[in-house]
A protein has these predicted regions:
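Short, low-complexity N-terminal intrinsically disordered segments enriched in polar/charged residues
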Residues: 1-34, 38, 172-187
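Hydrophobic alpha-helical core bundles mediating ligand binding, dimerization, or RNAP-core interactions
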Residues: 13-20, 24, 36, 60, ...
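Charged/polar, solvent-exposed surface patches and flexible loops
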Residues: 11, 15-18, 34, 62, ...
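A generic structural signal for ordered alpha-helices
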Residues: 2, 10-11, 38-42, 60, ...
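A solvent-exposed, acidic/Ser-Thr-rich amphipathic alpha-helical stretch
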Residues: 29-92
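A beta-strand edge to alpha-helix "cap/lid" segment located at domain peripheries
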Residues: 3-4, 68-187
Length: 187
């Protein structure tokens, strides 16, 4: 991966985070797809048996910003730290996951654990690769707690019931995410 000017990487993540913040406010995640190259790959782990994989901007729009965000209207994902590697053109962003409902103290309910995204920049203000990471057990417990309290959207309850039948979910044995990492340091 070629090096990119640090200022360009800083501007890219600034633009992306600003758009992410707007999407959280209005619930329209679709516009984030414009930040991905036509052949970008976006993945995350879904526990011990599954990975989520979207290949190309169309699948990212349809699945990441579509089916995977259904029921999460008005949830916000504020970024609290970004780390930039301008030699590899990569950025790691650490974020929180906040529900649009409050607890008994009036604070937004938060999914515990650490959430983050690892991006590879390809120039032209587009990501070519993204790998998200978050605490699956905290997410599951948080969503279940919200559902039991009647604070989870009906759409999200439906999604939880569908489990691994969501588009983009593949068995871990069928997808090697490490193989998608360019310029690995363990090779």
């Amino acid at each position: 991966m070629p090096a990119f000017p640090r200022a360009e990487l800083e501007e890219m993540i600034r633009r992306f985070v600003a758009a992410n913040d707007e999407c959280g406010k209005d619930g329209n995640w679709d516009r984030l797809a414009a930040f991905y190259a036509p052949d970008a790959v976006y993945t995350w782990n879904n526990g011990p048996k599954y990975e989520f994989v979207a290949r190309g901007r169309d699948e990212i729009r349809k699945w990441v910003m579509g089916t995977e965000m259904e029921g999460l209207d008005k949830w916000t994902y504020p970024y609290v730290r970004t780390l930039i590697d301008d030699q590899k053109g990569e950025i790691i962003g650490i974020w929180r996951q906040l529900a649009p409902v409050v607890d008994d103290d009036g604070k937004p309910i938060e999914i515990g654990g650490t959430g983050g995204s690892w991006f590879r920049y390809g120039g032209n203000w587009q990501w070519t690769w993204q790998r998200d990471f978050f605490d699956q057990s905290c997410a599951a417990a948080g969503f279940l707690d919200l559902m039991q309290k009647g604070k989870l959207s009906k759409k999200m309850e439906e999604r939880m019931k569908s489990g691994s039948r969501m588009p983009g979910w593949v068995k871990r044995s069928e997808f090697d995410w490490y193989g998608t990492v360019v310029d690995r340091e363990d090779e």
